[in-house]
Every structure is written in structure tokens, then in C-alpha cells.
């Protein structure tokens, strides 16, 4: 809002008001991110508890021991998933932004008068391009939480015998919970610091 007020040439008091609202919005956003991370962590713990409960109901209850290689492998894979997801999401944002830069340069080159203010840029084309790029780029990262557990369960059963997949999947859930919480907190505080720098 402050940028719009500045570009519109509105009076200084409008800018002061928008700055105050912006500060309140940033504070609210930072606080609610913490709540969201906490609730996601609790939801992940409930998911693990439900997993063990369903194993017990099915008569396939396993002991998730740290001396079990299947559990250790699951822990490492689970610990890797949040980092992999974060990296893929950041790469996706970079590629989507790059496509917008190319489109903006094309419009400056082909539509005469944009810099002088005599012609309007094609906003809808840039927004449409960004929307399509964002959806396309997030397909693979969004498949990670679906495909990795299936691959771990099937792969470990093939490699280490029947029952290893169940134990590895339990380890994977625990690993994802632990590293996922810390990655989320790190990204939240880092992003908040960069946002308010």
C-alpha cells in the first residue's frame, strides 16, 4: 500500500498511515506463522500416532528401534524431504520470476511508450504467465509427500524383507517431523528478518 501511495503522488500523511498499517500487518503475519508451524507440527505428531495405532489395529505393530537399519534409513530419508521440498520450491519461484522478467523485457521492447507513460503494459499476460509458471513449477514438489512414503515402503520391503517398509516408514515420519519443524522455524525467522530489513 505504501508503494501505491508513493507512486500515486498522494500526500505524506497517507504514506504515514500506510506505513503504520504495513507494520501491523508484518507483525501479525510473523506471529501467525509461528502458530501455523506449531499446529503443523502437532498435526504431524498426530499423523505418526495414527500410523502406529492403525498398525496395532491391523495386528502389524512394529518397534521403531534406533538399532534397526530400516528405521535409521527411514529417518535419513525423512530428514531429507523437508530440505528437498524447500529447495525445489525456491528453485520454482526463481524460474517463475525469470519467466516474468523475460515477458517484461519483451513488452518494453515491443510496446513503445511504456517508459514514457503513453502506453499501458499488458498486465494480464504477465499475470497469466506467472500463474501458469507457478502451477507448473510446483507439480513436482507437491508430489514429494505422496511419492516418497510409497517409494520408501515398497523399496525397503524389496531390499530388506517383509516388515522393513513399515518400520522405515515410521522412521521417515519421525525424521520429517523433526527436521520439518526446524526448517520451518528457520525459514520463518529468516524470511521475517529479510522482509523487514
UniProtKB/Swiss-Prot annotation:
EC number: 7.1.3.1
Recorded catalytic activity of this chain's protein: diphosphate + H2O + H(+)(in) = 2 phosphate + 2 H(+)(out)
Any GO CC annotation of this UniProt entry: plasma membrane
Cofactor: Mg(2+)
Topology class, membrane: Multi-pass membrane protein
Pfam families: H_PPase
Transmembrane segments: 30-50, 70-90, 139-159, 168-188
Superkingdom, taxonomy of origin: Bacteria
InterPro entries documented for this protein: PPase-energised_H-pump
Locations listed in the record: Cell inner membrane
Primary location recorded for the protein, binned into one broad class: membrane
GO MF annotations, alphabetized: diphosphate hydrolysis-driven proton transmembrane transporter activity; inorganic diphosphate phosphatase activity
Key words of the record: Cell inner membrane, Cell membrane, Hydrogen ion transport, Ion transport, Magnesium, Membrane, Translocase, Transmembrane, Transmembrane helix, Transport
Function description: Proton pump that utilizes the energy of pyrophosphate hydrolysis as the driving force for proton movement across the membrane. Generates a proton motive force.
Subunit structure: Homodimer.
Protein's name according to its UniProt entry: K(+)-insensitive pyrophosphate-energized proton pump
Species for this entry: Allochromatium vinosum (Chromatium vinosum)
Gene: hppA
Amino acid at each position: 500500500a505504501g508503494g501505491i501511495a508513493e507512486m500515486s503522488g498522494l500526500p505524506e500523511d497517507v504514506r504515514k498511515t500506510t506505513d503504520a498499517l504495513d507494520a501491523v500487518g508484518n507483525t501479525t503475519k510473523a506471529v501467525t506463522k509461528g502458530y501455523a508451524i506449531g499446529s503443523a507440527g502437532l498435526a504431524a505428531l498426530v499423523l505418526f500416532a495414527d500410523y502406529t495405532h492403525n498398525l496395532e489395529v491391523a495386528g502389524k505393530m512394529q518397534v521403531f528401534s534406533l538399532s534397526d537399519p530400516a528405521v535409521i534409513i527411514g529417518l535419513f530419508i525423512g530428514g531429507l524431504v523437508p530440505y528437498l521440498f524447500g529447495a525445489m520450491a525456491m528453485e520454482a519461484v526463481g524460474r517463475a520470476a525469470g519467466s516474468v522478467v523475460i515477458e517484461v523485457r519483451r513488452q518494453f521492447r515491443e510496446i513503445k511508450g511504456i517508459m514514457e507513460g503513453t502506453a499501458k503494459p499488458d498486465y494480464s499476460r504477465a499475470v497469466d504467465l506467472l500463474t501458469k509458471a507457478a502451477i507448473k513449477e510446483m507439480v513436482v514438489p507437491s508430489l514429494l509427500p505422496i511419492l516418497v512414503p510409497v517409494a520408501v515402503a515398497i523399496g525397503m520391503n524389496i531390499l530388506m524383507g517383509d516388515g522393513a517398509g513399515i518400520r522405515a516408514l515410521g522412521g521417515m515420519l519421525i525424521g520429517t517431523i523433526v527436521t520439518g519443524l526446524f526448517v520451518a522455524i528457520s525459514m520463518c525467522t529468516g524470511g521475517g528478518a529479510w522482509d523487514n530489513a
